[in-house]
Protein backbone atom coordinates (compact mmCIF):
# COMPACT_ATOMS: atom_id res chain seq x y z
CA UNK A 1 0.00 0.00 0.00
CA UNK A 2 1.20 3.49 -0.75
CA UNK A 3 0.42 4.91 2.67
CA UNK A 4 2.35 8.08 1.97
CA UNK A 5 0.29 8.78 -1.13
CA UNK A 6 -2.77 9.20 1.03
CA UNK A 7 -3.30 12.57 2.73
CA UNK A 8 -1.89 12.43 6.24
CA UNK A 9 -5.25 13.14 7.85
CA UNK A 10 -6.73 10.11 6.10
CA UNK A 11 -4.12 7.48 6.85
CA UNK A 12 -5.66 6.38 10.14
CA UNK A 13 -8.91 5.36 8.53
CA UNK A 14 -7.25 2.58 6.57
CA UNK A 15 -4.01 1.84 8.37
CA UNK A 16 -5.59 -0.86 10.51
CA UNK A 17 -6.11 -3.04 7.46
CA UNK A 18 -2.81 -2.29 5.79
CA UNK A 19 -0.53 -5.12 4.80
CA UNK A 20 2.43 -2.87 4.07
CA UNK A 21 3.17 -1.10 7.32
CA UNK A 22 6.65 0.12 6.49
CA UNK A 23 7.21 3.61 7.88
CA UNK A 24 8.69 5.98 5.35
CA UNK A 25 11.36 8.44 6.34
CA UNK A 26 12.17 7.28 9.88
CA UNK A 27 15.53 5.76 9.04
CA UNK A 28 18.56 7.80 10.08
CA UNK A 29 19.41 10.09 7.15
CA UNK A 30 22.57 9.08 5.33
CA UNK A 31 24.64 10.33 2.47
CA UNK A 32 23.63 8.70 -0.78
CA UNK A 33 25.57 5.72 -2.09
CA UNK A 34 24.32 3.25 -4.70
CA UNK A 35 26.10 0.04 -5.55
CA UNK A 36 28.14 -0.05 -8.75
CA UNK A 37 29.34 2.88 -10.84
CA UNK A 38 26.78 3.10 -13.63
CA UNK A 39 24.40 5.35 -11.70
CA UNK A 40 26.08 8.60 -10.65
CA UNK A 41 24.84 11.16 -8.13
CA UNK A 42 23.75 14.44 -9.69
CA UNK A 43 25.69 17.53 -8.61
CA UNK A 44 22.96 19.57 -6.93
CA UNK A 45 22.99 22.94 -5.21
CA UNK A 46 23.77 22.44 -1.49
CA UNK A 47 20.25 23.36 -0.35
CA UNK A 48 18.70 20.56 -2.42
CA UNK A 49 21.39 17.98 -1.69
CA UNK A 50 20.97 18.68 2.02
CA UNK A 51 17.18 18.61 1.76
CA UNK A 52 17.19 15.17 0.15
CA UNK A 53 19.19 13.84 3.10
CA UNK A 54 17.44 15.65 5.95
CA UNK A 55 13.89 15.19 4.63
CA UNK A 56 14.33 11.72 3.17
CA UNK A 57 11.47 9.44 2.20
CA UNK A 58 8.93 11.97 0.99
CA UNK A 59 7.20 12.38 -2.34
CA UNK A 60 9.92 12.88 -4.96
CA UNK A 61 8.47 12.14 -8.42
CA UNK A 62 10.51 12.54 -11.59
CA UNK A 63 9.36 12.87 -15.20
CA UNK A 64 11.46 12.93 -18.37
CA UNK A 65 10.30 13.71 -21.91
CA UNK A 66 11.40 10.83 -24.12
CA UNK A 67 13.54 11.78 -27.09
CA UNK A 68 14.75 15.01 -25.45
CA UNK A 69 17.26 15.89 -22.73
CA UNK A 70 14.62 17.40 -20.43
CA UNK A 71 13.59 16.07 -17.01
CA UNK A 72 11.93 17.48 -13.90
CA UNK A 73 12.25 16.11 -10.37
CA UNK A 74 10.22 17.34 -7.41
CA UNK A 75 12.35 17.33 -4.25
CA UNK A 76 12.09 18.68 -0.69
CA UNK A 77 13.42 22.17 -0.02
CA UNK A 78 14.28 22.87 3.62
CA UNK A 79 14.71 26.58 2.88
CA UNK A 80 11.17 26.82 1.53
CA UNK A 81 8.77 26.54 4.46
CA UNK A 82 5.05 26.35 3.67
CA UNK A 83 1.84 25.95 5.65
CA UNK A 84 3.44 27.59 8.66
CA UNK A 85 6.34 25.25 9.34
CA UNK A 86 6.13 22.39 6.82
CA UNK A 87 9.05 21.70 4.50
CA UNK A 88 8.15 22.79 0.99
CA UNK A 89 9.23 21.47 -2.38
CA UNK A 90 11.19 22.63 -5.39
CA UNK A 91 11.37 21.64 -9.04
CA UNK A 92 14.80 20.51 -10.23
CA UNK A 93 15.23 20.96 -13.98
CA UNK A 94 17.77 19.47 -16.37
CA UNK A 95 17.96 20.29 -20.07
CA UNK A 96 21.14 18.32 -20.74
CA UNK A 97 20.14 14.78 -19.78
CA UNK A 98 21.05 15.13 -16.12
CA UNK A 99 24.51 16.65 -16.40
CA UNK A 100 23.40 19.90 -14.74
CA UNK A 101 20.37 20.78 -12.62
CA UNK A 102 18.66 24.08 -11.75
CA UNK A 103 16.25 24.43 -8.84
CA UNK A 104 13.09 26.55 -8.82
CA UNK A 105 11.21 27.05 -5.54
CA UNK A 106 8.10 28.24 -7.36
CA UNK A 107 5.65 25.37 -6.84
CA UNK A 108 2.33 26.42 -5.29
CA UNK A 109 2.64 26.63 -1.51
CA UNK A 110 -1.00 25.58 -1.13
CA UNK A 111 -0.48 21.85 -1.64
CA UNK A 112 1.97 18.96 -1.36
CA UNK A 113 2.95 17.49 -4.72
CA UNK A 114 2.49 13.72 -5.00
CA UNK A 115 2.81 13.11 -8.75
CA UNK A 116 4.28 14.72 -11.87
CA UNK A 117 3.98 14.35 -15.63
CA UNK A 118 5.78 16.30 -18.36
CA UNK A 119 4.15 16.30 -21.78
CA UNK A 120 6.76 18.49 -23.50
CA UNK A 121 9.97 20.36 -22.70
CA UNK A 122 7.81 23.28 -21.61
CA UNK A 123 4.56 21.84 -20.26
CA UNK A 124 4.40 19.76 -17.08
CA UNK A 125 1.63 19.08 -14.59
CA UNK A 126 1.70 18.16 -10.90
CA UNK A 127 -1.04 16.92 -8.62
CA UNK A 128 -1.26 16.46 -4.88
CA UNK A 129 -3.27 17.30 -1.77
CA UNK A 130 -3.99 20.73 -0.32
CA UNK A 131 -2.78 21.75 3.10
CA UNK A 132 -6.09 23.48 3.87
CA UNK A 133 -8.64 20.74 3.20
CA UNK A 134 -6.71 17.64 2.16
CA UNK A 135 -8.52 17.76 -1.16
CA UNK A 136 -6.98 17.21 -4.60
CA UNK A 137 -4.98 19.93 -6.33
CA UNK A 138 -3.27 20.48 -9.67
CA UNK A 139 -0.75 22.94 -11.12
CA UNK A 140 0.89 23.53 -14.50
CA UNK A 141 4.10 24.99 -15.85
CA UNK A 142 4.41 26.25 -19.41
CA UNK A 143 8.01 27.43 -19.16
CA UNK A 144 9.75 24.19 -18.35
CA UNK A 145 9.36 24.30 -14.59
CA UNK A 146 10.60 27.82 -13.91
CA UNK A 147 7.17 28.99 -12.74
CA UNK A 148 3.99 27.12 -11.82
CA UNK A 149 0.33 28.11 -11.85
CA UNK A 150 -2.15 26.59 -9.40
CA UNK A 151 -5.09 25.47 -11.57
CA UNK A 152 -7.10 23.70 -8.88
CA UNK A 153 -10.85 24.19 -9.48
CA UNK A 154 -12.65 25.80 -6.56
CA UNK A 155 -15.12 22.92 -6.29
CA UNK A 156 -12.30 20.47 -5.56
CA UNK A 157 -11.99 21.81 -2.00
CA UNK A 158 -14.38 19.14 -0.72
CA UNK A 159 -13.97 16.60 -3.50
CA UNK A 160 -14.49 13.00 -2.31
CA UNK A 161 -11.44 11.68 -4.19
CA UNK A 162 -7.65 12.01 -4.30
CA UNK A 163 -5.11 11.81 -7.10
CA UNK A 164 -2.21 9.40 -6.62
CA UNK A 165 -0.86 9.63 -10.18
CA UNK A 166 -1.04 11.78 -13.29
CA UNK A 167 -0.12 11.16 -16.92
CA UNK A 168 -0.29 13.82 -19.63
CA UNK A 169 0.03 12.35 -23.13
CA UNK A 170 -0.33 15.85 -24.61
CA UNK A 171 0.14 19.39 -23.34
CA UNK A 172 -3.63 19.81 -22.90
CA UNK A 173 -4.79 16.27 -22.05
CA UNK A 174 -4.07 14.81 -18.63
CA UNK A 175 -5.41 11.81 -16.74
CA UNK A 176 -5.37 11.42 -12.94
CA UNK A 177 -6.17 8.35 -10.86
CA UNK A 178 -6.57 7.52 -7.19
CA UNK A 179 -9.16 6.44 -4.64
CA UNK A 180 -12.61 7.78 -3.87
CA UNK A 181 -13.13 8.72 -0.25
CA UNK A 182 -12.18 6.43 2.60
CA UNK A 183 -13.75 3.34 1.05
CA UNK A 184 -11.00 2.49 -1.44
CA UNK A 185 -13.04 2.76 -4.57
CA UNK A 186 -11.40 3.94 -7.82
CA UNK A 187 -11.44 7.42 -9.28
CA UNK A 188 -10.33 8.68 -12.69
CA UNK A 189 -10.33 12.30 -13.82
CA UNK A 190 -9.44 13.78 -17.21
CA UNK A 191 -8.97 17.18 -18.83
CA UNK A 192 -8.74 17.75 -22.57
CA UNK A 193 -8.59 21.55 -22.48
CA UNK A 194 -5.52 22.29 -20.41
CA UNK A 195 -7.27 22.12 -17.07
CA UNK A 196 -10.15 24.48 -17.84
CA UNK A 197 -12.58 21.62 -17.15
CA UNK A 198 -12.21 18.14 -15.68
CA UNK A 199 -14.35 15.02 -16.10
CA UNK A 200 -14.81 12.62 -13.18
CA UNK A 201 -15.70 9.21 -14.61
CA UNK A 202 -18.62 7.32 -13.14
CA UNK A 203 -18.45 4.31 -15.45
CA UNK A 204 -15.39 2.50 -14.08
CA UNK A 205 -15.46 -1.31 -13.82
CA UNK A 206 -16.90 -2.63 -10.57
CA UNK A 207 -15.83 -5.61 -8.46
CA UNK A 208 -17.39 -7.21 -5.36
CA UNK A 209 -17.07 -4.94 -2.35
CA UNK A 210 -15.26 -5.77 0.88
CA UNK A 211 -15.49 -4.06 4.29
CA UNK A 212 -12.58 -1.82 3.22
CA UNK A 213 -13.73 -1.12 -0.33
CA UNK A 214 -13.21 -2.50 -3.82
CA UNK A 215 -9.94 -1.19 -5.28
CA UNK A 216 -8.04 2.04 -5.65
CA UNK A 217 -5.86 3.14 -8.56
CA UNK A 218 -2.19 3.97 -8.02
CA UNK A 219 -0.77 4.53 -11.49
CA UNK A 220 -1.74 5.31 -15.08
CA UNK A 221 0.08 5.30 -18.41
CA UNK A 222 -1.35 6.56 -21.70
CA UNK A 223 0.02 5.87 -25.17
CA UNK A 224 -2.32 8.49 -26.65
CA UNK A 225 -4.90 11.00 -25.49
CA UNK A 226 -7.58 8.28 -25.65
CA UNK A 227 -5.75 5.05 -24.81
CA UNK A 228 -4.70 4.45 -21.19
CA UNK A 229 -3.97 1.64 -18.73
CA UNK A 230 -4.53 2.23 -15.00
CA UNK A 231 -3.39 -0.10 -12.21
CA UNK A 232 -4.05 -0.56 -8.51
CA UNK A 233 -5.59 -2.94 -6.00
CA UNK A 234 -7.07 -3.13 -2.53
CA UNK A 235 -4.83 -1.80 0.21
CA UNK A 236 -4.85 -4.37 2.99
CA UNK A 237 -6.42 -7.01 0.78
CA UNK A 238 -5.03 -10.28 -0.54
CA UNK A 239 -5.42 -9.52 -4.24
CA UNK A 240 -6.01 -9.64 -7.04
CA UNK A 241 -4.36 -6.49 -8.31
CA UNK A 242 -6.63 -4.51 -10.62
CA UNK A 243 -5.98 -3.24 -14.14
CA UNK A 244 -8.49 -1.19 -16.11
CA UNK A 245 -8.08 0.04 -19.67
CA UNK A 246 -9.74 2.39 -22.12
CA UNK A 247 -9.11 2.96 -25.82
CA UNK A 248 -11.85 5.51 -26.44
CA UNK A 249 -11.07 8.33 -24.05
CA UNK A 250 -12.95 6.80 -21.13
CA UNK A 251 -16.27 6.22 -22.89
CA UNK A 252 -15.84 2.53 -22.07
CA UNK A 253 -13.50 0.60 -19.77
CA UNK A 254 -12.32 -3.00 -19.52
CA UNK A 255 -11.24 -4.85 -16.37
CA UNK A 256 -8.43 -7.39 -16.75
CA UNK A 257 -9.28 -10.90 -15.57
CA UNK A 258 -5.72 -12.16 -15.99
CA UNK A 259 -4.81 -15.01 -13.63
CA UNK A 260 -1.37 -13.47 -13.07
CA UNK A 261 -2.99 -10.68 -11.04
CA UNK A 262 -4.24 -13.15 -8.42
CA UNK A 263 -2.21 -13.03 -5.23
CA UNK A 264 -0.74 -9.66 -6.19
CA UNK A 265 -2.01 -7.13 -3.67
CA UNK A 266 -1.41 -4.00 -5.69
CA UNK A 267 0.33 -2.64 -8.75
CA UNK A 268 1.78 0.73 -7.80
CA UNK A 269 2.79 2.04 -11.22
CA UNK A 270 2.64 1.17 -14.91
CA UNK A 271 4.57 2.13 -18.04
CA UNK A 272 3.09 1.48 -21.50
CA UNK A 273 4.46 1.92 -25.01
CA UNK A 274 3.18 1.32 -28.54
CA UNK A 275 4.32 -2.08 -29.78
CA UNK A 276 4.95 -3.47 -33.22
CA UNK A 277 1.74 -4.31 -35.03
CA UNK A 278 -0.27 -1.53 -33.40
CA UNK A 279 -0.69 -3.03 -29.95
CA UNK A 280 0.46 -1.78 -26.55
CA UNK A 281 3.09 -3.31 -24.28
CA UNK A 282 2.91 -2.48 -20.57
CA UNK A 283 5.01 -3.21 -17.51
CA UNK A 284 3.39 -2.94 -14.08
CA UNK A 285 5.33 -2.68 -10.81
CA UNK A 286 3.94 -3.55 -7.41
CA UNK A 287 3.85 -5.84 -4.42
CA UNK A 288 2.87 -9.34 -3.41
CA UNK A 289 3.31 -11.22 -0.14
CA UNK A 290 5.23 -14.42 0.51
CA UNK A 291 2.84 -17.25 1.38
CA UNK A 292 5.17 -18.67 4.04
CA UNK A 293 6.39 -15.53 5.84
CA UNK A 294 3.85 -12.88 4.85
CA UNK A 295 6.62 -10.44 4.00
CA UNK A 296 6.30 -8.05 1.08
CA UNK A 297 7.96 -8.88 -2.23
CA UNK A 298 8.42 -6.42 -5.07
CA UNK A 299 7.47 -7.64 -8.53
CA UNK A 300 7.05 -6.65 -12.17
CA UNK A 301 4.36 -7.96 -14.51
CA UNK A 302 4.25 -7.52 -18.28
CA UNK A 303 1.38 -7.35 -20.76
CA UNK A 304 1.72 -7.64 -24.53
CA UNK A 305 -1.96 -7.11 -25.37
CA UNK A 306 -3.02 -3.65 -24.18
CA UNK A 307 -3.26 -4.65 -20.51
CA UNK A 308 -5.68 -7.55 -20.99
CA UNK A 309 -3.39 -10.40 -19.87
CA UNK A 310 -0.26 -10.30 -17.73
CA UNK A 311 2.73 -12.47 -16.82
CA UNK A 312 5.16 -12.04 -13.94
CA UNK A 313 8.68 -11.25 -15.15
CA UNK A 314 10.49 -10.28 -11.93
CA UNK A 315 10.16 -10.80 -8.17
CA UNK A 316 12.47 -9.77 -5.33
CA UNK A 317 12.01 -11.19 -1.85
CA UNK A 318 13.18 -7.98 -0.23
CA UNK A 319 10.40 -7.02 2.18
CA UNK A 320 9.56 -4.02 0.04
CA UNK A 321 7.83 -3.08 -3.17
CA UNK A 322 8.40 -1.40 -6.51
CA UNK A 323 7.00 2.11 -6.33
CA UNK A 324 7.75 3.36 -9.85
CA UNK A 325 8.58 1.98 -13.29
CA UNK A 326 9.68 3.59 -16.56
CA UNK A 327 10.23 1.88 -19.91
CA UNK A 328 12.10 3.58 -22.74
CA UNK A 329 11.25 0.73 -25.09
CA UNK A 330 9.39 -2.55 -24.98
CA UNK A 331 12.68 -4.16 -23.87
CA UNK A 332 14.32 -1.50 -21.68
CA UNK A 333 12.79 -0.75 -18.27
CA UNK A 334 13.87 0.42 -14.84
CA UNK A 335 11.84 0.04 -11.64
CA UNK A 336 12.47 1.96 -8.41
CA UNK A 337 12.06 0.25 -5.06
CA UNK A 338 10.60 1.24 -1.71
CA UNK A 339 10.80 -0.14 1.79
CA UNK A 340 14.07 -2.01 1.19
CA UNK A 341 17.65 -1.47 0.08
CA UNK A 342 16.91 -2.63 -3.48
CA UNK A 343 16.89 0.85 -4.97
CA UNK A 344 16.54 -0.02 -8.66
CA UNK A 345 16.03 -3.01 -10.94
CA UNK A 346 16.50 -2.91 -14.70
CA UNK A 347 16.08 -5.06 -17.79
CA UNK A 348 17.30 -4.65 -21.36
CA UNK A 349 15.77 -7.83 -22.76
CA UNK A 350 12.06 -7.39 -22.16
CA UNK A 351 12.10 -8.79 -18.65
CA UNK A 352 13.92 -12.07 -19.27
CA UNK A 353 16.72 -10.98 -16.94
CA UNK A 354 17.08 -8.20 -14.39
CA UNK A 355 19.93 -6.38 -12.67
CA UNK A 356 19.50 -4.79 -9.24
CA UNK A 357 21.15 -1.73 -7.74
CA UNK A 358 21.27 -1.57 -3.96
CA UNK A 359 21.45 1.43 -1.66
CA UNK A 360 22.86 2.09 1.78
CA UNK A 361 19.52 3.32 3.13
CA UNK A 362 16.07 1.80 3.39
CA UNK A 363 12.49 3.08 3.48
CA UNK A 364 12.84 5.05 0.26
CA UNK A 365 9.95 5.89 -2.04
CA UNK A 366 11.95 5.60 -5.23
CA UNK A 367 10.96 7.21 -8.53
CA UNK A 368 12.48 6.71 -11.98
CA UNK A 369 11.95 8.08 -15.50
CA UNK A 370 13.86 7.38 -18.71
CA UNK A 371 14.77 9.68 -21.58
CA UNK A 372 15.99 6.85 -23.79
CA UNK A 373 17.20 3.28 -23.65
CA UNK A 374 20.50 4.50 -22.24
CA UNK A 375 19.63 7.56 -20.14
CA UNK A 376 17.41 7.49 -17.05
CA UNK A 377 16.99 9.61 -13.92
CA UNK A 378 16.06 8.23 -10.50
CA UNK A 379 15.28 9.93 -7.22
CA UNK A 380 16.21 7.42 -4.53
CA UNK A 381 18.65 6.83 -1.68
CA UNK A 382 18.59 10.48 -0.59
CA UNK A 383 19.71 11.80 -3.96
CA UNK A 384 19.12 12.31 -7.66
CA UNK A 385 20.88 9.70 -9.78
CA UNK A 386 21.60 9.55 -13.51
CA UNK A 387 22.74 6.78 -15.82
CA UNK A 388 23.87 7.30 -19.42
CA UNK A 389 24.65 3.65 -20.17
CA UNK A 390 21.36 1.99 -19.20
CA UNK A 391 22.68 1.32 -15.72
CA UNK A 392 25.45 -0.85 -17.14
CA UNK A 393 23.06 -3.37 -18.66
CA UNK A 394 24.28 -5.22 -21.72
CA UNK A 395 21.93 -4.55 -24.64
CA UNK A 396 20.08 -7.61 -25.83
CA UNK A 397 21.51 -9.09 -29.01
Question: What are the language-model segments listed below?
Answer:
Residues 2-16:
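N-terminal export and membrane-targeting signals
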Residues 33-397:
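Residue-level hotspots at or immediately adjacent to binding/recognition sites across diverse folds
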Residues 13-25:
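Bacterial N-terminal signal peptides
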Amino acid sequence: MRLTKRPSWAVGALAAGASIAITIGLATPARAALSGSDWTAANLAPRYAKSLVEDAGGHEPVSCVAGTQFCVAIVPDIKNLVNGSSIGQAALITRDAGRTWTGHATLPSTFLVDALSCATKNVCWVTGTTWATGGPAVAETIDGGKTWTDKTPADWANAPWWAFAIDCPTATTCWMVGPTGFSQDPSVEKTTDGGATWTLFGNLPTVPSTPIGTYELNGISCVSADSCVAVGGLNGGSGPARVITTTDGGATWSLSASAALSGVQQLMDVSCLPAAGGGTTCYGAGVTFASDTGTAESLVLASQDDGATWAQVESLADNGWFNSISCASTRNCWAAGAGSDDALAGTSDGGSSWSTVTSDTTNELGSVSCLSGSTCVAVTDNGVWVTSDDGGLTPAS
